[in-house]
């Protein structure tokens, strides 16, 4: 019995199988950890909507924020186009600092947590490695009352003004200035290192207001407040 043809067929099948397994799968799952800076502008126009007085100034300060994502990526090896989508946790934060010529100062710090979805189109100019991403994300606000307040308004030199306590002012802000869901467009640059690691630098700009002003008796007005996030992250990707 001639077994040579059978051995040849078996060897061919093994060779084809080895080639199939060696091919790079276009689907990958990834875990991303990162941090960045965030700011929300327009809060000053909520608190002081008109020129009631002068000799004061506001300043918006960026705040550190974390981000975590679980995502899926599709990119055929050698292709210019890829896509990415997943679930993310992120924060939007900012700090508004007030000072005036009476030496009154306060800090208002909104910090909101979000869980949502993201989708990005990725362009690989050199077909691998470096990529440009364009897309957006949308998420639910987990802590709509996530605003804090600090001030020296309880100092004796302001006794004649009969200011509310710091605790009461913060309570009112939590009640009347509520955090909203986040819908943002964004994009950035990334670089994939080998088969498993990736670095990304991305920017997101909020399309809707971060804070909604509820009806109140404190002259706080409704005004658009758009958040911005800059995030640097590292990812680990798993082949499927």
Summary of predicted features, one role per range:
Residues 31-37, 66-74, 87-89, 117-123, ...:
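Residues on the lipid-exposed face of transmembrane beta-strands in outer-membrane beta-barrel proteins
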Residues 79-83, 129-130, 195-201, 240:
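Repeated loop/turn-to-beta-strand initiation elements of outer-membrane beta-barrel proteins
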Residues 226-240:
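Outer-membrane beta-barrel "beta-signal"
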């Amino acid at each position: 019995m001639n077994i040579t043809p059978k051995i040849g067929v078996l060897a061919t099948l093994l060779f084809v199988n080895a080639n199939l397994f060696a091919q790079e799968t276009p689907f990958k799952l990834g875990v991303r950890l990162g941090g960045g800076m965030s700011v929300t502008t327009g809060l000053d126009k909520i608190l002081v909507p008109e020129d009631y007085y002068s000799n004061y100034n506001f300043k918006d300060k960026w705040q550190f924020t974390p981000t975590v994502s679980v995502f899926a990526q599709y990119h055929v090896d050698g292709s210019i186009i890829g896509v990415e989508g997943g679930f993310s946790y992120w924060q939007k934060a900012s700090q508004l600092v007030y000072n005036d010529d009476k030496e009154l100062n306060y800090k208002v710090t909104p910090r909101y947590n979000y869980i949502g979805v993201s989708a990005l189109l990725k362009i690989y100019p050199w077909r691998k490695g470096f990529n440009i991403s364009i897309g957006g994300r949308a998420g639910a606000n987990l802590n709509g009352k996530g605003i804090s307040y600090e001030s020296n308004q309880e100092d004796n030199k302001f006794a004649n003004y009969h200011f509310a306590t710091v605790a009461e002012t913060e309570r009112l802000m939590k009640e009347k200035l509520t955090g909203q869901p986040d819908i943002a467009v964004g994009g950035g640059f990334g670089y994939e290192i080998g088969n498993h690691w990736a670095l990304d630098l991305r920017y997101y700009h909020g399309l809707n207001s971060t804070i909604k002003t509820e009806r109140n008796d404190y002259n706080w007005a409704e005004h658009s407040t758009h958040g911005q996030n800059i995030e640097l992250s590292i990812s680990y990707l798993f082949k499927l």
